[in-house]
């Protein structure tokens, strides 16, 4: 994030625009709407702009810009002339005086940028691109305009009228936030939109009278293999309402960014033989936070019920009498194979697929080898990188062809995805050669040969 978005109160604050044409007029409208006192410095001032100056009780200085014009006390300054040299000079002089300054469409000479705005006062939504693409910002604003009802401003104003009373009655900030979230999902919203304020006030009074502190709950959420666009809608909704997010090493940073920003985030990362928090500790954390009345999102890479130890966690929750939800995620086998261009089943090559873990409880991959050498079958190994050489040797020893195709998909579905293809006889030697690191999925079977034709990334 290269810029820090803020909302600036400008009521009765004196602001300066240097420039008197249509560029200045566009910015002046926004400043006057925000309640600013508007001064203009320009040799020629558009009549419409002059009326805005009068409306705001500001001053028109009909002259060329001079450095001392900034010696007056201004909250912010906008350079809006069609002369780049003048705009740069305004910027430099404002910087010397530590004034917030914007040069219209001239990013190097800006201390702040004016975003595209969706106005549902008192609710405001802004879209900014750090000056990289104002047109894109405006297009996004147009899309958002269609999604946000005009009545949202009324709802924000209505909420403001009740805010003090709600705060006085529900003193716990987390509980208060849940109260408002539930209220905004209730029929009250439509009553406010339709100006039925008497009914809305009655509903508010009743909601406060009936309010009880919520019980804690755990959401066991599959985050998928890494690409945030592979999240389910339900996963995203629960991630954004959770008070606490307990996440592991396989949850990618872009996915974690989608969680509620003010949620407490607890890292319990797991790597082979290096668990920052052991499974028993994770189970205890889930119970502790839920018993404290928190909504807890246990965020897991892939799917929580496929080699994710989700079953163990909800057994603990069940024993403690804690309510929970389970949200499936796209498992690594599905996501990584698709992004690698390797179908796990194909009528000509594989009529079945088996998911296996190469990292067993005792630390050694002892698998039913004779069952794994059937024809027309795809094997998918999770956590099999360390024991891959042993696995390949055992498959060959139990009758599998040494030239059976194998693919390693490292960090699948992410921008760092790497795919290495080999055979049972040589794939282990390629790990060091291509610097393959966990998390890596191993796919064994004739379907791997289709990658050459079907890869799309």
From Swiss-Prot:
Pathway: Cofactor biosynthesis; adenosylcobalamin biosynthesis; precorrin-2 from uroporphyrinogen III: step 1/1; Cofactor biosynthesis; adenosylcobalamin biosynthesis; sirohydrochlorin from precorrin-2: step 1/1; Porphyrin-containing compound metabolism; siroheme biosynthesis; precorrin-2 from uroporphyrinogen III: step 1/1; Porphyrin-containing compound metabolism; siroheme biosynthesis; siroheme from sirohydrochlorin: step 1/1
Leader sequence segment: none
The keyword Lyase is annotated on this UniProt entry: yes
CDD domains, per database record: SUMT
Residues at the catalytic site: 248 (proton acceptor), 270 (proton donor)
Alphabetical UniProt keywords: Cobalamin biosynthesis, Lyase, Methyltransferase, Multifunctional enzyme, NAD, Oxidoreductase, Phosphoprotein, Porphyrin biosynthesis, S-adenosyl-L-methionine, Transferase
Binding site for NAD(+): 22-23, 43-44
InterPro entries: 4pyrrol_Mease, 4pyrrol_Methylase_sf, 4pyrrole_Mease_sub1, 4pyrrole_Mease_sub2, CobA/CysG_C, NAD(P)-bd_dom_sf, Siro_Cobalamin_biosynth, Sirohaem_synt_dimer_dom_sf
Region (Uroporphyrinogen-III C-methyltransferase): 216-457
Top-level taxon of origin: Bacteria
EC number of the protein: 2.1.1.107, 1.3.1.76, 4.99.1.4
Catalyzed reaction equations: uroporphyrinogen III + 2 S-adenosyl-L-methionine = precorrin-2 + 2 S-adenosyl-L-homocysteine + H(+); precorrin-2 + NAD(+) = sirohydrochlorin + NADH + 2 H(+); siroheme + 2 H(+) = sirohydrochlorin + Fe(2+)
Binding residue positions for S-adenosyl-L-methionine: 225, 301-303, 306, 331-332, 383, 412
Annotated stretches, region: Precorrin-2 dehydrogenase /sirohydrochlorin ferrochelatase: 1-204
Disulfide bond residue pairs: none
One GO term (biological process): cobalamin biosynthetic process
Modified residues (Phosphoserine): 129
MF terms (GO), sorted A to Z: NAD binding; precorrin-2 dehydrogenase activity; sirohydrochlorin ferrochelatase activity; uroporphyrin-III C-methyltransferase activity
HAMAP family in UniProt: Siroheme_synth
Job description of the protein: Then it catalyzes the NAD-dependent ring dehydrogenation of precorrin-2 to yield sirohydrochlorin. Finally, it catalyzes the ferrochelation of sirohydrochlorin to yield siroheme.
Family affiliation: In the N-terminal section; belongs to the precorrin-2 dehydrogenase / sirohydrochlorin ferrochelatase family. In the C-terminal section; belongs to the precorrin methyltransferase family.
Protein name: Siroheme synthase
Species for this entry: Acinetobacter baylyi (strain ATCC 33305 / BD413 / ADP1)
């Amino acid at each position: 994030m290269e810029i820090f978005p803020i909302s600036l109160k400008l009521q009765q604050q004196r602001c300066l625009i240097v420039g008197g044409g249509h560029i200045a007029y566009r910015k002046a409208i926004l400043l006057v709407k925000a309640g600013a006192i508007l001064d203009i410095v320009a040799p020629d001032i558009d009549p419409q702009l002059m009326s805005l100056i009068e409306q705001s009780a500001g001053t028109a200085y009909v002259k060329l810009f001079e450095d001392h014009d900034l010696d007056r006390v201004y909250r912010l300054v906008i350079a809006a002339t069609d002369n780049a040299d003048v705009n740069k000079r305004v910027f430099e002089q404002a910087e010397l005086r530590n004034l917030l300054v914007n040069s219209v469409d001239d990013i190097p000479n800006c201390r702040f940028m004016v975003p595209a705005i969706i106005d549902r006062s008192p609710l405001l939504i802004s879209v900014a691109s750090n000056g990289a693409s104002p047109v894109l910002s405006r297009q996004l604003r147009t899309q958002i305009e269609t999604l946000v009802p005009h009545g949202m401003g009324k709802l924000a104003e209505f909420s403001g009228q009740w805010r003090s009373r709600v705060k006085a009655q529900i003193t716990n900030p987390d509980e208060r936030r849940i109260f408002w979230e539930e209220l905004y999902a209730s029929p009250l919203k439509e009553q406010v939109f339709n100006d039925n304020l008497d009914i809305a006030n009655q509903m508010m009074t009743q909601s406060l009278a009936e309010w009880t502190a919520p019980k804690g709950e755990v959401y066991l959420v599959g985050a998928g293999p890494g690409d945030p666009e592979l999240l389910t809608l339900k996963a995203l909704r629960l991630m954004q309402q959770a008070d606490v997010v307990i996440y592991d090493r396989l949850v990618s940073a872009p996915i974690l960014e989608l969680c509620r920003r003010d949620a407490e985030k607890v890292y319990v990362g797991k790597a082979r033989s290096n668990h920052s928090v052991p499974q028993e500790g994770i189970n205890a954390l889930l119970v502790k936070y839920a018993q404290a009345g928190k909504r807890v999102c246990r965020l897991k890479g892939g799917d929580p019920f496929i080699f994710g130890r989700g079953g163990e966690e909800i057994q603990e929750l069940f024993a403690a009498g804690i309510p929970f939800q389970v949200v499936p995620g796209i498992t690594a086998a599905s996501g990584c194979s698709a992004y690698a261009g390797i179908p796990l089943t194909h009528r000509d090559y594989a009529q079945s697929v088996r998911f296996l873990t190469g990292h067993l409880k005792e630390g050694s991959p002892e698998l039913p080898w004779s069952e794994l050498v059937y024809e027309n079958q795809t094997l998918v190994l999770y956590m099999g990188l360390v024991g891959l050489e042993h696995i390949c040797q055992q498959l060959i020893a139990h009758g599998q062809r040494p030239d059976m195709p194998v693919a390693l998909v490292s960090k699948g579905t992410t921008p760092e995805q790497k795919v290495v293809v080999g055979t049972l006889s040589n794939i282990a030697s390629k790990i060091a050669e291509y610097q393959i690191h966990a998390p890596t999925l191993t796919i064994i079977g004739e379907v791997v040969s289709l990658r050459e034709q079907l890869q799309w990334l």
